[in-house]
Amino acid sequence: MRKIGVKIEVNSVVGKLFTVDELMQEFNFDAVFIATGAGLPHFMNIPGENLNGVYSSNEFLTRCNLMKAYRFPEYATPINVGKKVAVVGGGNVAMDSARTALRLEAEKVYIVYRKSEKELPSRREEVEHAKQEGIEFKLLNNLVAILGDEKGYVKAIRCIKMELGEPDASGRRRPVEISNSEFDIDVDTVVIAIGQGPNPLIQSTTPDMQTNKRGNIIADEETGKTTKEGVFAGGDIVTGAATVILAMGAGKKAAKAIDEYLIEKRNK
């Protein structure tokens, strides 16, 4: 990218060190493309999520794969995976996290999911592979607390049993708690894999750029144009967590639209 003239500014947090408006007004950029993704992990806001041994799936997989934690101390990014690991969630990332934990020599790995197997959002083959590798599925169970020892480390999770209620307006059966059905599972590592969303930093400092209720930027599907003049956006920050292919496609469409926008602006 540098070879074709792209200048890369590192350690520059847009929305904190300067805003989108400042980029355009003080730094004289004619157009801005926002492609900050949807990498902010969701947590459950339950007791014990701040204990040692609790990871988001983002951090867990990033440490294991990109930062090569499995080769510590050769690489200086350790990750402490205990003998018993609970992964909370039912998507593809949850399956990836569970299978990765096994490869890091965990003796027992659980998938904790509040609905039944039929409702698992992960691909069918991911579920089958996880089962073949020995991962135990704790279905129709919901995590309500993470329990710690006197030193602040995870020692167990507390779950409550669920049952599927009547279908709602969308036809989906929502899980309902079964009263007085709480139980504990001894674990020493917990991975929360319940999805991720956009970091609100740029959106919150750009009030005239519209977002949806999830915090994603509203942009034209074909051009990436937002509701703010000269500002374009694409990828997961618009669609929510999706695929690399879709993000690349959005970038190409936006590049064409930005080029046309700049030409039109010069000719005015």
Which role does the model predict for each range below?
Residues G90, Y113-S116, G148, D236:
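Cofactor-binding loop segments of dinucleotide-utilizing enzymes, especially the Rossmann-like FAD-
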Residues N50-G82, P167-A241:
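FAD-site-proximal beta/loop scaffold in flavoenzymes
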Residues Y70-A106:
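Rossmann-like NAD(P)H-binding beta-loop-alpha module
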Residues M1-K3, I8, A98-A145, K268:
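Rossmann-like dinucleotide-binding cores of NAD(P)H-dependent redox enzymes
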Residues G234-K265:
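A conserved FAD-binding loop/helix module that cradles the flavin
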Residues M1-I46, A145-R158, E163-E166, T189-V191, ...:
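Feature captures the FAD/FMN-dependent oxidoreductase FAD-binding
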